[in-house]
Swiss-Prot record:
First and last residue of the signal peptide: none
Name of the protein: Small ribosomal subunit protein uS17
Keyword annotations: Ribonucleoprotein, Ribosomal protein, RNA-binding, rRNA-binding
Pfam families according to UniProt: Ribosomal_S17 (PF00366)
Protein's job: One of the primary rRNA binding proteins, it binds specifically to the 5'-end of 16S ribosomal RNA.
Subunit and interaction comment: Part of the 30S ribosomal subunit.
Length: 90
């Protein structure tokens, strides 16, 4: 293997969101909100998406603010993993 193929410098997406479900074993559902401007009318809208993330130690709970990172497919719907818990729920 050459040095170029040994070192991959792929940029992985990192998102912050709120944990909306932690009922599954080693999996959390994270609601990620993004503010986008409408292309024609210019109104700023909030778009949200629910992503499933891998939580190896079941650390995150409902209402926690977390940072997740894109990874290889771990299951049929899981392509993200928990990086850190930014703020625990009160």
């Amino acid at each position: 293997m050459s040095e170029n193929t040994a070192e991959r410098t792929t940029r992985r997406k990192v998102r912050e969101g709120l944990v909306v479900s932690d009922k599954m074993n080693k999996t959390i559902t994270v609601m990620v909100e993004d503010r986008v401007k409408h292309p024609l009318y210019g109104k700023v809208m909030t778009k949200s998406v629910r992503l499933k993330a891998h939580d190896e130690n079941n650390e995150a709970g409902m209402g926690d603010r977390v940072r997740i990172m894109e990874t290889r497919p771990l299951s049929a719907t899981k392509r993200w993993r928990l990086v850190e818990i930014i703020e625990k729920a009160k």
